[in-house]
Regions:
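A short alpha-helical cap/connector motif
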Residues: 1-134, 144-190
Length: 190
């Protein structure tokens, strides 16, 4: 009884989205496109999680910042074909931040931000914070890839501007709904 009252959304997120094992309709299509063939198992697992998150939360807009092969954004786009999504693949800090600012100003708010592998993750996070709303959520990749990023992730978790956070070891999830108690969860995902 206490679990239903205290943790319904978080419990559902963990049990029905993060730990979900059922094959989704788009997995086969994405595999045919070749995205699953060359990815290591853990990357495929993360991309499928990204698919399930977008499938559940249905953001109207998604911005991905980072350098990659396009597999993550392909999984997320497959979950919501009506979503306005853009990938900013800049290696140039100033140019990428300018593109991000322009896109955020165009959208007026950010529903979902995926901070993938980028050396200027802190600046991307701070820039996007001005555009969050209670339903906004961020996906932060590689939260343990360096000592500096680990330290920064701890700062994000402690930041009063964020609400609930999830540490999935390879990625971090940040939610901004202040109607819920600030809480940090460590989930054994990988």
């Amino acid at each position: 009884m206490w679990l239903r009252r205290a943790l319904p959304v978080r419990f559902f997120l963990i049990t029905s989205i993060i730990y979900e094992r059922s094959p989704y309709y788009a997995y086969r299509t994405l595999k045919k496109r070749g995205f699953s063939n060359y990815l290591p198992h853990y990357r495929r697992k993360v991309n499928r999680l990204l698919f399930r998150l977008v499938n559940y939360f249905r953001p109207k807009s998604l911005i991905e910042v980072g350098i990659g092969n396009g597999a993550s954004i392909s999984y997320m786009r497959a979950a919501s074909r009506t979503m306005d999504s853009v990938t900013l693949k800049g290696r140039d800090r100033d140019k990428t931040l300018l593109q991000l600012t322009k896109k955020l100003e165009e959208l007026k708010s950010v529903d979902c931000l995926h901070i993938a592998h980028t050396p200027f993750y802190q600046e991307v996070f701070e820039e996007a914070l001005s555009y969050v709303q209670p339903d906004s959520w961020f996906i932060i990749g590689g939260i343990y890839e360096s000592q500096e990023k680990r330290k920064w992730w701890k700062e994000v978790v402690a930041d009063e501007r964020v609400g609930i956070t999830f540490d999935l070891y390879d990625i971090g999830l940040v939610f901004f709904n202040k109607n819920r108690y600030k809480q940090h969860y460590i989930v054994n995902f990988l």
